[in-house]
Amino acid sequence: MDTYEELSLEASKFIQDLTLYEASKDGLFRVDKGASNNPEFEETKRIFAAKMAKIHLQNQQKNIPDTGTSEGNGSNLQYTYSMPKSVEEVPVTYNGQSSSSVGQSDYKTYRESYKVKPEIDSADSSEEPVIRHEHETMLLSPVSKVGHAIPSQQFTCKKAISPSNESLERERIGSENMHSDLNLSSMINCKPMEKNTPHNKCSPLISSSVIFGEETNTHIPQQKFFNLSSPSSINLQKTSDHVCLSETKAAKEFNGEQRGFCSTNSLNSGSSNDVKLSALSSYCVGYNENSSDQIKQMQAPCYTFNSGHSSADEQPQEIPFSCTDSSAEPPASTLDSDHIDIVQDSSTLMKIKLPCQTLSQSSKQGSSRAEKKLEAITRHLEQEMDAHTRADYFGTCVKCSKGVYGANQACQAMGNLYHNGCFICSACSRKLRGKAFYFVNGKVYCEEDFLYSGFHQSADRCFVCGHWIMDMILQALGKSFHPGCFRCAVCNECLDGVPFTVDMENKIYCVKDYHKILAPKCAACSLPILPSEGTDETIRVVSMDKDYHIDCYRCESCALELNNEDDHRCYPLEGHLFCHNCHLKYLENHNLS
């Protein structure tokens, strides 16, 4: 508890103002933006990290079980993996013996850096070997450059997790390995090296997981998988005849718009005391339709590791694979034994093409649907036009007795309604709307046909001048006029298209002159009673058969305005207008006299 209290006090120094802190890349600390150059802060951070690492190692050592053995008549095989104190040193022990340390700059080859020495009894046994794991293990992954031979291997340490939640980890590893394998760009070339087993071939692994299991000549029995972290994982399994190291890789199915293919190689059975590493991997290669021209192909052969003897009929297997991403280097990890040779057989490498799934073009829909839609729209427009034209109904044509719809189809002449196509010249069938026409004996003629056909002898005469109307005719009051002859009798203004009036003597007047001449005159002021300005209505007062302006209708004695009110009523006497009081006075004076 004292340790944790001390750590909590030191940690509280970092969290004084949360707004000034941001998460660091390693996820262990929170760094003050303003204190990046503070030496005291850096020293405190280093001490805090060292104490956390120390407590972590102490908890790990408490959980490490002692190395045990499996007693019995069968094989005695022990495997112990321990967490190194630093990344520079990766010890792996088998039966108490540790492999040579892996340095940071110069790394030894497979044979020198990683040795597997299992102790297997020759006698048959039914008991299972003791397989021991620690909470965390380290995996050696060779780091190589693409396109160069690998005379000596460089290794990086990758942290693994405990073999719990097997199914969930297998799915997570599969998704991570799938994305890591898509970063391969070109082949890893391996120079052939001839040693004890010249027929064996090896190449750097793409992703690996080690399986220690028992194997017979015909099949592989039950296997216990211990899935580890990405992209490689170590799986252990018991064996009775020999130990087989195989490489597995979990893959998940693609979904969405990507497509892929999987190539899987099975594990071949071998003789006893053999250690094999074969690629049991299913590479899921994503294929993007938009970048199909950027696909590059690459192959990697299968690799087999033999610890001692191998049968003559065993042949290495090769797994060609392809990758779509040509910008990333392939991650690799390799396990080795005493007699591992790295060779390459370029003659057996074959390039394969990615299976492209052609997208079936959906057949274009026939034009029948578009035509039907167009017909429906056309019918709708026709219905709207019909509804609009029916609203502009003018009447019935006197010639064809059919309805006239729309102002552009109506023509009115001589007080009758015609269609434009019905009001035509009787001789040449020319449309006469807006043109001069002649009506002779119930027929209509255009001007040319009337002048040169002799029909003018029977044409109408002008009511004013008495001459034949040879051009346009103006009809009013049942009579025919020349347009120039139809004028006001007072001001002589042409009344063609202007309102006019006629008196009892059939004299034509404009409205203004009619009111001046024919309007009634006021009995009081002797002026004509005209309509108000801007209107055609005339307002007057009639009393004793006389006409008066409204303002002139007053008492002649006191000039009181007379109207229908009680005190303003008119009391005429002897042709004079009087109010009630003046009327009484006039009667009294008349009686006295």
Swiss-Prot record:
InterPro entries: Ajuba-like, Ajuba-like_LIM1, Ajuba-like_LIM2, Ajuba-like_LIM3, Znf_LIM. Disulfide bonds: none annotated. Residues 395-456, 460-520, 521-589 form the LIM zinc-binding domain. GO terms for biological process: neural crest cell development. SUPFAM superfamilies: Glucocorticoid receptor-like (DNA-binding domain). Belongs to the zyxin/ajuba family. This is LIM domain-containing protein 1. It comes from Xenopus tropicalis (Western clawed frog). The lineage of its organism: Eukaryota, Metazoa, Chordata, Craniata, Vertebrata. The gene is limd1.
